[in-house]
Amino acid sequence: MGSKMSDPLVIGRVIGEVVDYFTPSVKMSVTYNSSKHVYNGHELFPSSVTSKPRVEVHGGDLRSFFTLIMIDPDVPGPSDPYLREHLHWIVTDIPGTTDCSFGREIVGYEMPRPNIGIHRFVFLLFKQKKRQTLLSAPLSRDRFNTRKFSEENELGSPVAAAFFNCQRETAARRR
């Protein structure tokens, strides 16, 4: 393990702006279109993240349950993110050692649509104390607060996280 300062989640300000420092205890992989892997801080184009990704939990067991949250902390733009955080997806009751398709989608996937600047899109995985821990879906996608949601639903600190950068594409950049 490297120092906290070399952690891409610290460098990318996910730790600090979105969640407090935590030690990952579960491995999570995020893949779009079966070939575009999410690596912390790497860029993906909006055209490659239109459909929901496969998110695999490599930890726990079938008796462990996890909640996945995807947010954009940079709305409407990174220089003035007054709508922070924008909620893109929540899936609960994901059994350990499986993927999010085995969970319960509380908030449907919304594809990234960054308008101004480079946005971070963050996946956070929390271990639930038991199945069906979460009460209900948030009323709004804007001004979502991961820390508050985690506290209200007794999720504690994340057990895994990943993020990618994304910015608006010009027609010439679309692939």
UniProtKB/Swiss-Prot annotation:
PROSITE patterns on file: PBP
Induction and repression of expression: Down-regulated at the onset of flowering.
Keyword vocabulary terms for this entry: Cytoplasm
BP GO annotations: negative regulation of flower development; vegetative to reproductive phase transition of meristem
Stored Gene3D superfamilies: PEBP-like
Tissue localization of expression: Expressed in vegetative axillary meristems but not in the main shoot meristem.
Entry GO terms, CC: cytoplasm; nucleus
Location within or outside the cell: Cytoplasm
Primary localization class, coarse: cytoplasm
CDD domains with a match to the protein in the record: PEBP_euk
UniProt cross-references to SUPFAM superfamilies, sorted A to Z: PEBP-like
Protein function: May form complexes with phosphorylated ligands by interfering with kinases and their effectors.
Family statement: Belongs to the phosphatidylethanolamine-binding protein family.
PANTHER family listed in its UniProt record: PHOSPHATIDYLETHANOLAMINE-BINDING PROTEIN, PROTEIN CENTRORADIALIS-LIKE
Name by which UniProt lists this protein: CEN-like protein 4
Organism: Nicotiana tabacum
Chain's gene name: CET4
